[in-house]
Amino acid sequence: MAFTVYDCHEDIRNILVTPQIRARFCRLEPGSGSLDFGHTHDLGHEIFIILEGRVEFQISGNVNELGPGQMCYALVDEPHSVRVIGEEPVLMYLSVTPHIQPTHTFYDDDRNRRPPHFRPSSDYNTETDSTTPMDEIIDRHVDTARELYECARENLATQEAQAALLKRALTDDDLETANAIRETMWLPQLELFKQMHTTADVWNTLAPRAGSVNAHY
């Protein structure tokens, strides 16, 4: 099956946007950006890879210069900002995982958290579902939350039932039994994580229509 190849010179946009990840190419012009306190992500780790040009990144108060072929990252709750240095435009890849609204947390001049900053889906180069009635989306959101709860209950029951068996197998150095128990423990966790992604997907559909939104920064 064919797949799409993307080019950092032509596809300057969000390319992949799912609850698991948001990935994009960016172009930053000379003189743009600043090393202010910046913003944070409540849930997401963000990775930056410089493809062309040079920048300075500020992450949690520390500043470093990056050039082509270099990367850095900002973890959850780490304030970060960037500015271009030199006369050359910057091409950069970035990804944030996971991608769940509200994606950015901003701060006032005293570094106090501002209210949640929900954004329209168009900010991420995706379309908001504007045709499905909101009552239906809200009901779907509640249904997926309930399914997540049931998955969590089933997962907990399995982990509790298998924990002592796994301890015994490892104590006895019985790796064959331990391998089988580990697989038994993994399967309900797999379903739990899948349901978490489904729940996040419905939430990302609900959030832009559930109140006011603020475009861009």
Regions found by a protein language model. Give the residues of each.
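A generic "binding-loop/recognition-motif" signal
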Residues: 43, 62, 78-79, 88
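Double-stranded beta-helix
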Residues: 85-149
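A short glycine-rich, His/Asp/Glu-containing loop-to-beta-strand
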Residues: 2-38, 44, 95-104
